Each structure stands twice: as structure tokens, then as C-alpha cells.
Regions:
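C-terminal structural segment of proteins
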Residues: 1-309
Length: 309
């Protein structure tokens, strides 16, 4: 099994969620570590989350990427964890992310050693939730990834990297390694990312909201994208809400109506921190806050972002 930063893999190995016989370290592959911003942004998959969050060009031209990377876990883990690793990070569930003893005592679940989803016993698929902070932003910005295998190489949109199953949540083939992330030039766009978690550090997202808009000179929305994380096995695009925003200005009434549409695709279950009805309601609130930030409303809980136009 390949390993880069190992900030998620190693704890999972200690809990016997993964039991690889061999680990292949990738950290010495310097060619997969660089960050270049010549028109589009190219991120080497081994660039650390700290490198991404503090890179001057990323902060200036793709500030939502910098923010999402900077909200992952804690500073020591961001110093080790990689952007590629966060895109590929394992799905999470209260019944899965436990010690071996705990999981054995309840009979295991289908994600590891069992055959029943303990969140939804009647389901034929696993409902462990997507726990990546950076993927919603990458999808909102139309990013792509390069996947390399011994005999092939392909480039796919980030949104095609994920599937509707908490076990087989990546479309990446076992022999493929994610080597680069490519983000289009988004000058003229406003973008943001908001994260909901119990504590202000360390915790995985129980909700993430990425939003990006391109405004006309009169302030009307020309294009919009809203992506939710932490509410399903993969990031969820709120397409109906994005379509609703087109041609409208980001005034409070429009924002509230769009947020009321955007939260409907969220499908949280009782498999993460805090109650799922509350997390569903918070999706509406956090979308409104994200759109409000793009519309120029103050966000006292986060440092304001600046967008290059």
C-alpha cells in the first residue's frame, strides 16, 4: 500500500482498519511535490497541506483552496499530510473509526470484516461519509487530477474521482497513484469554503461548504457552484441552488432562498459527530453564510478572503 504523509493511514492501521503487509513510501518523490501557478494551478500530490495553505499564489488567486487546506486537522498534521492524501482520505463512520476491540464487540460492519451497514441495516451499500476538506473546493473550481499507473496515465475531473459507496469511494484503480491536481485559472471568480466541526482544530468535517460565483459588472451572478462535503459518501453538488442564483444578485433574500434549495441534497445519517437532524439544518445555514461572504457580508468567525478580479 502506498503512503505519503500517513496522517490518516497510520491511526487506521493502529485500529486494524487497514492491515497492509507492505507500505511503499512516496515522500522522496520530489517531482510530485511542487506547486506552480502559470495560468492554471498545478499541485503536486505530495505538496503538504501547509505548503498549499501558505503558498502566496494559491492564497492570492485560489483563496478557497488555501483556506480548505488550512482548516484540515492541526498544524503538526498539516505539516505532514499531503494535498493528494486529503483528496483520497478514507470515508468515516462512528461504527468504523473505533478500536478493533470495540468493533469486534458489536459484530463489525460491512466496511471492515462484517456484512451489514450498522447505520442503515437494510442498505446494500456502506454509508460512511466523505471526510475530505479540499475535494468540495476542487469540484467547485472544476479541478482535475492526474492518475498514473505502470502502463497508463489519465486525467479526470475531481468530481469523477468519487462514487456513491463508503467502501469503494474512489474511482481510482488499485494500481493508480494520484500525482497532480490541476485547477483552472479562476480570476474573476469569488470563492470560499466553510467547515463545521465540534472543535476549532483537529476534527474532520461534519459539514463542508464550498461556493464559487462569477459576477457580472452589475453584480448579477453569471455562474455559480455549490458543493457540500461531509453529508454523503462523496461530495454533493447543489446544482439546483447554483442554477437558481444565475441572473440574480447576492442579496439577503436571494441567499436565503438559494440556501433553502442547496441543503436538500444533503443526506447526513447518524454516523458522525453531533446529531444528523442538526447537521442537515446547519447545511442550510452554512450555505447562506458562504454565499453571504461572497456577497460581501461580514464573516466574524473567519478571516476575510480577498479575490483577484
Amino acid at each position: 500500500m502506498p503512503v505519503a504523509g500517513g496522517t490518516d493511514l497510520y491511526p487506521n492501521m493502529k485500529r486494524r482498519q487497514f492491515t497492509p503487509r507492505v507500505l511503499v513510501g512516496l515522500r522522496l518523490l520530489d517531482e510530485a511535490r511542487g506547486i506552480t501557478a502559470n495560468g492554471e494551478l498545478t499541485l503536486g500530490a505530495l505538496a503538504t497541506l501547509t505548503d498549499v495553505s501558505e503558498h502566496p499564489e494559491v492564497r492570492r488567486r485560489w483563496p478557497a483552496i488555501a483556506r480548505s487546506a488550512g482548516l484540515v486537522s492541526s498544524p503538526p498534521l498539516r505539516n505532514a499530510g499531503t494535498i493528494g492524501g486529503n483528496l483520497c482520505v478514507d470515508t468515516r463512520c462512528n461504527y468504523y473509526n473505533q478500536t478493533e476491540f470495540w468493533r469486534a464487540s458489536i459484530g463489525y460492519c460491512m466496511k471492515r470484516d462484517g456484512d451489514v451497514c450498522l447505520v442503515a441495516p437494510g442498505s446494500e451499500t456502506c454509508w460512511a461519509i466523505s471526510s475530505t476538506d479540499t475535494a468540495p473546493v476542487m469540484i467547485a473550481l472544476g479541478a482535475e487530477v492526474t492518475l498514473v499507473a505502470p502502463d497508463s496515465e489519465r486525467r479526470i475531473p475531481v468530481k469523477e474521482l468519487y462514487g456513491p459507496d463508503g467502501i469503494n469511494y474512489l474511482s481510482k484503480r488499485p494500481e493508480e497513484i494520484l500525482t497532480q491536481i490541476h485547477v483552472p485559472d479562476r480570476r474573476g471568480w469569488k470563492m470560499t469554503y466553510r467547515k463545521l466541526r465540534r472543535r476549532g482544530s483537529i476534527d474532520f468535517p461534519i459539514l463542508g461548504v464550498a461556493a464559487a460565483v462569477r459576477l457580472a459588472k452589475d453584480g448579477a451572478v453569471q455562474e455559480a457552484r455549490i458543493v457540500l462535503g461531509g453529508v454523503y459518501t462523496s461530495p454533493v453538488e447543489a446544482r439546483d441552488a447554483a442554477d437558481f442564483l444565475k441572473g440574480r444578485s447576492l442579496d439577503p433574500a436571494t441567499i436565503e432562498m438559494a440556501a433553502g434549495i442547496a441543503y436538500k441534497p444533503a443526506r447526513p445519517l447518524d454516523n458522525a459527530d453531533l446529531g444528523y437532524p442538526w447537521r442537515k439544518r446547519m447545511a442550510r445555514i452554512e450555505v447562506a453564510r458562504a454565499l453571504g461572504e461572497l456577497g460581501g457580508l461580514p464573516t466574524p468567525d473567519l478571516a476575510p478572503l480577498r479575490w483577484e478580479v
